[in-house]
Curated annotation (Swiss-Prot):
One of its GO terms (biological process) is chorismate biosynthetic process. Homodimer. This is Shikimate dehydrogenase (NADP(+)). It comes from the Bacteria. The lineage of its organism: Bacteria, Pseudomonadati, Pseudomonadota, Alphaproteobacteria, Rhodobacterales. It comes from Cereibacter sphaeroides (strain ATCC 17029 / ATH 2.4.9) (Rhodobacter sphaeroides).
Length: 279
C-alpha cells in the first residue's frame, strides 16, 4: 500500500476498554465529515504497552488516545512530551510522527475549560475560588487548567491527604489542601466546584459531601458522565447553581487529536452529543 492510498488509523488504548465512548465519537465524526479513516479500540495490558506503541506506526496508525491505566506510563515512552503533559504527569493523546518519534500531549484540561465555556457561558473563573475534590490524574489536569485561566485560589480535598499534598507541591501556592472531612466546609464563596473523583459513578460509592455551604452563584461540574445527572449535579441545581455534566469534557478533549490525525477540526455540538449518547 503506498503512502498516497494509505487510510489513516487511530484508536484508543487502555484496559479495560469496552466501556469507552471514544470509538462512537470518532466514528461519528469520520462519517459526519466524509473522511477516510478508522478508529479502533484496543485492550492493551501494561506488560505489552511498549511493544504495542512500537508496532502501531508500522500498522498504519497515525496516533491514538490513551486511557486508564496507561496515561502515566506513556509519558516515559514518548520522545516528545508537551509542557502541560509533563506538568500533569500523564498523556491522553499520542501522535506518531513521520520521523518515527512519538509526540505526547494532554488535552483533558482544555477539554474541561471548553466544556464549561460552552455550557456555562457566564462562567468567570477569575471571580472567586475553586473547589476541587480528588487528587488523581484528572484533578491534576483540571488544576493546571484552572490556574491557566486565572482562578485566584484552589481549595483541594481528597480522601488521601498525602496525594493532595503531593499535588500542591507540584502546582504551588494557589492550591490549599483540606482534609476530606472538611470537603463540604470549603464551599463558601467558591465560584467553581469540580468533582474529579469516581464518587457517584455507576458501580461506585455514592457522592455524599454535604452541600449546605454551596454558593448559588457557583458553576458546579462533575467529571462523571455515567450517569449524566449525578447526585452532586441534582443537589447543586436544586441550590440554584449552574451545573455542567462531564460528557462535554470527553467530547472537547477528543477534538484536538481528531484534527491532528484526520485533518479536520470537528464540531462539538448537540448533534455530536446525541450521537455519542445513542451509541
Amino acid at each position: 500500500m503506498t503512502e498516497l492510498t494509505r487510510i489513516p488509523l487511530a484508536g484508543v488504548i487502555g484496559s479495560p476498554i469496552a466501556h469507552s465512548r471514544s470509538p462512537a465519537l470518532h466514528g461519528y465524526w469520520l462519517k459526519r465529515y466524509g473522511l477516510k479513516g478508522h478508529y479502533i479500540p484496543m485492550d492493551v495490558a501494561q506488560a505489552d504497552l511498549r511493544d504495542v506503541l512500537a508496532a502501531m506506526p508500522r500498522m498504519g496508525f497515525v496516533g491514538c488516545n490513551v486511557t486508564i491505566p496507561h496515561k502515566e506510563s506513556v509519558i516515559g515512552l514518548a520522545d516528545i512530551v508537551t509542557d502541560r503533559a509533563a506538568l500533569i504527569g500523564a498523556a491522553n493523546t499520542l501522535i506518531f510522527r513521520k520521523d518515527g518519534k512519538i509526540y505526547a500531549d494532554n488535552t483533558d484540561g482544555t477539554g474541561f475549560t471548553a466544556n464549561l465555556r460552552q455550557n456555562a457561558p457566564a462562567w468567570q473563573p477569575q471571580s472567586g475560588p475553586a473547589v476541587v475534590w480528588g487528587a488523581g490524574g484528572a484533578a491534576r489536569a483540571v488544576i493546571a487548567a484552572l490556574i491557566e485561566v486565572g482562578v485566584p485560589e484552589i481549595r483541594l480535598a481528597n480522601r488521601s491527604r498525602a496525594r493532595a499534598d503531593a499535588l500542591r507541591s507540584d502546582f504551588g501556592a494557589k492550591v490549599h489542601v483540606h482534609d476530606w472531612v472538611q470537603a463540604g466546609n470549603i464551599l463558601e464563596d467558591a465560584m467553581t466546584v469540580v468533582n474529579t473523583t469516581s464518587l457517584g459513578m455507576v458501580g461506585k460509592p455514592e457522592f455524599r459531601v454535604p452541600l449546605d455551604a454551596l454558593n448559588p452563584k457557583a458553576v458546579v461540574t462533575d467529571l462523571v458522565y455515567a450517569p449524566l445527572r449525578t447526585r452532586l449535579l441534582v443537589e447543586a441545581e436544586a441550590a440554584g447553581c449552574r451545573t455542567v455534566d462531564g460528557l462535554g469534557m470527553l467530547l472537547h478533549q477528543a477534538a484536538p487529536g481528531f484534527e491532528r490525525w484526520f485533518g479536520v477540526r470537528p464540531e462539538v455540538d448537540e448533534e455530536t452529543r446525541a450521537a455519542v449518547l445513542a451509541a
